[in-house]
Amino acid sequence: MPSISTNIVLAFITALLGMLIFRSHLMSSLLCLEGMMLSMFILSTLTILNLHFTTSFMMPILLLVFAACEAAVGLALLVTVSNTYGLDYIQNLNLLQC
């Protein structure tokens, strides 16, 4: 495995561990999720370019579209929660209440 791919996989694992460790704050969880999406984008782009998959050149772009949608929804949720409760602790949220 080349060193670039190894570094990207380590970045994904680091973001995943950050997601598991810092799951008490919504902002930290969203940042780790964005790091995971970025490393998945780079790894899929490198894989497609190295293996010459001409039929799947749109896959990284589609991944970026979903990452942008996820970031927009996460930011809207973060703003709503911080305006309502004044903090971004996930433990204080009860999602069953309307």
From Swiss-Prot:
Principal location: mitochondrion
Enzyme Commission code(s) on record: 7.1.1.2
Spans traversing the lipid bilayer: 2-22, 29-49, 61-81
Enzyme class: translocase
Upper taxonomic lineage: Eukaryota, Metazoa, Chordata, Craniata, Vertebrata
Gene Ontology MF terms: NADH dehydrogenase (ubiquinone) activity
InterPro entries for this protein: NADH_UbQ_OxRdtase_chain4L/K, NUOK/Mnh_C1-like
Its membrane topology: Multi-pass membrane protein
GO-annotated biological processes: ATP synthesis coupled electron transport
Reaction it catalyzes: a ubiquinone + NADH + 5 H(+)(in) = a ubiquinol + NAD(+) + 4 H(+)(out)
Organism: Eulemur rubriventer
Keyword Disulfide bond: no
Stored PANTHER family: NADH-UBIQUINONE OXIDOREDUCTASE CHAIN 4L, NADH-UBIQUINONE OXIDOREDUCTASE SUBUNIT ND4L
Record-given protein name: NADH-ubiquinone oxidoreductase chain 4L
Gene: MT-ND4L
